[in-house]
Amino acid sequence: MSDKKLKITQVRSIIGGTKKQKATIQALGLGRPHYTVERKDNPCTRGQIRVVQHLVKVEEV
C-alpha cells in the first residue's frame, strides 16, 4: 500500500467548515480550490481524506 500515491485536489472552499476540517486541509497541504498535492497512500492520509471528503477529489496515481 505504501508504493501507491494519491493525487488530492481541493474542489470546494473551506469557508463555513469546522476548525477540524480547516486544520485537516492545511495538514494535507491544500488551502484553496484547485490546489493539488500528491501524498502516500497510507491509513493516516486516508483518515484525513475521510474528514474532508466533501471538499476534495482523490485519484490513485
Swiss-Prot record:
GO BP field: translation
Entry keyword set: Ribonucleoprotein, Ribosomal protein
Record carries keyword Cell membrane: no
GO cellular component, one term: cytosolic large ribosomal subunit
Signal sequence interval, chain numbering: none
InterPro entries (UniProt xref): Ribo_uL30_ferredoxin-like_sf, Ribosomal_uL30_bac-type, Ribosomal_uL30_ferredoxin-like
Keyword NADP among UniProt keywords: no
GO molecular function, one term: structural constituent of ribosome
Quaternary organization: Part of the 50S ribosomal subunit.
Entries under HAMAP family matching the protein: Ribosomal_uL30_B (MF_01371_B)
PANTHER family: LARGE RIBOSOMAL SUBUNIT PROTEIN UL30M (PTHR15892:SF2), MITOCHONDRIAL RIBOSOMAL PROTEIN L30 (PTHR15892)
Similarity section: Belongs to the universal ribosomal protein uL30 family.
Name listed for the protein in its UniProt record: Large ribosomal subunit protein uL30
Name of the gene encoding the protein in the UniProt record: rpmD
